[in-house]
Amino acid sequence: GPMGWVPVFYRF
């Protein structure tokens, strides 16, 4: 998703 620094399960 737009956030690349968060874990993959947090990527929406």
UniProtKB/Swiss-Prot annotation:
Tissue: Expressed by the venom duct.
Membrane-spanning segments: none
Sorted UniProt keywords: Amidation, G-protein coupled receptor impairing toxin, Neurotoxin, Secreted, Toxin
The keyword Secreted is annotated on this UniProt entry: yes
Modified residues (Phenylalanine amide): F12
Gene Ontology terms: cellular component: extracellular region
Annotated compartments: Secreted
Keyword Lipoprotein: no
GO molecular function: toxin activity
Summary of the function given for this chain in its UniProt record: This peptide activates mouse sensory neuron-specific G-protein coupled receptors MRGPRX1, but not human receptors. In vivo, causes hyperactivity in mice when injected intracranially.
Family: Belongs to the FARP (FMRFamide related peptide) family.
Note: The mature peptide does not contain cysteine residue.
Name by which UniProt lists this protein: Conorfamide-Sr1
Organism, scientific name: Conus spurius
